[in-house]
Amino acid sequence: MNRFYFAYGSNMNPDRIRERIPQARLVGKATIKGWRLVERLYADIECAKGCTVEGVLYLVSQTELYRLDAYEGFPNIYGSVQVNAWLDAKHCVNAQTYMMTATTKAARSGRPYPKEYRLICSTGAEYHGVKNEFRREGDPPFGYRGEGWGDAKVRKGAAKLDEWWHPLPDLGGGNAKR
């Protein structure tokens, strides 16, 4: 069974998500309401009335969610949480995302993003056109892929990434709220 997954940090980056779960289908940008993005060494979210977090919505299999669990350190580093992800003003789907555990929050509170991680997140945000809360003055231009990723794994140009874009024809199924 397929599920929606909402990414708000490094998994917004097309290269990163393809490396981790290559069969994920990109749905598009989405927003979760009543949450805010928090910098705790790595991206985190927390409930916050009146706030929103912009990110990217993917359609993934249960097997891919298990793989993401491993990458995210579930259940020790990040816990899984269900959110309502809004695709536009009318369409909302239930999606899984991750939120740091209380122990992780305490250990990482007040610690800034490592530059490499922040640049990976920033590139993903810019690629998808979501609010970029990761970019800092003096950062390299859009398209930065990150050191240590290996040139063989890096897609050259947007044309290759666009081959991966397969929007779903209809989101009105059982998961959609209207």
Feature roles, as predicted:
Residues 1-178:
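Glycine-aromatic micro-motifs
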